[in-house]
Amino acid sequence: MTTHLTLTEDDGIRPDIDDRDVATLIPDAVTAVLDTAGTWLGWDGRPILRDGNAWTPHKALRRVADHLLDHLTEIECRLAGRPTVPDHWHGRRVTTDADFARFTEVDLDEATSRLTRLAACYQARLGGLPAQTLDARPDEATWTIREVVHHVSNVTYYADMVGRLTAP
């Protein structure tokens, strides 16, 4: 049996795009996330309440990794001509017990390793794609790959929900 929350969050608004190289958007966003995460060592264990949710360092990094992975699989499926698999997990809406764990140097090191490797996958995959592929719209309801990448580059939102906790 599969169970999941049935919340939907499709506002139908396409993300803004600009002329930045899509291959650099995710690595730049990950660098910004990790810069903020570096200030979370010594977090006091209390969740930060922002934008209708409880946020912790672990939850923010979980959401960044989930978001990067979800959309990377979407892009890969589309480029392979395969149907995408809808995401029924609404991880932003829940805070797990694991999200309340202490945030240590080891956690930052793990996040750095994981997120920089995901960013490298985006850079490698997107770097050689022609504009025609990046801007193809399979149907009116589907975002272009360029729009997806610009959307994903906003993963800095999750780190911003925790914010900078100490001086770097």
Region locations from a protein language model:
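Aromatic-glycine hotspot motif
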Residues: 1-168
